Amino acid sequence: MSVEHQDAMYDHILVPTDGSAGSVKAAEHAVDLAEKYSGDIHALYVVNVGRLEGMSLNVPGSIDRLEEEGKEYIQDVVDTAENAGVEATSAIELGRPAKTIIEYADENGSDLIVIGTQGRGGLSRRLLGSVTEQVVRLANVPVHTVRADED
């Protein structure tokens, strides 16, 4: 008895990015999976409103500056995908990262989330990173974590 390989296992792969080494490595891994399963990539950057608390959102350019930073990060993911012949789309959302990533995955029919284990939080992050840990616990789709130093 043979089991057929399911080619369309991951049609839509979500790659949240913050420009960190972990998210860059996650994007590369996601593109490999998209190639293997003929899927596409959704690059997502979340402007973290938690970082903005206590700051005046009326300061000229405060949100714009963070969105511009995010555009660079998601463009890197899109370029990686397109260079491999994988279709890619991108989005910038305003919110709390873990919650926004999960909502985006649900609203856009993502089959898989590929996320780095450590973002830009440095030493304040524990083992996985607080955003990654929350996404792993709460997402309604499979989550694949990728270490920044993974070969």
Language-model segments: which ranges?
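Gly/Ser-rich helix-loop-strand patches that form or flank binding pockets
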Residues: 1-2, 107-151
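Structural beta-alpha unit
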Residues: 2-8, 79-113, 150-151
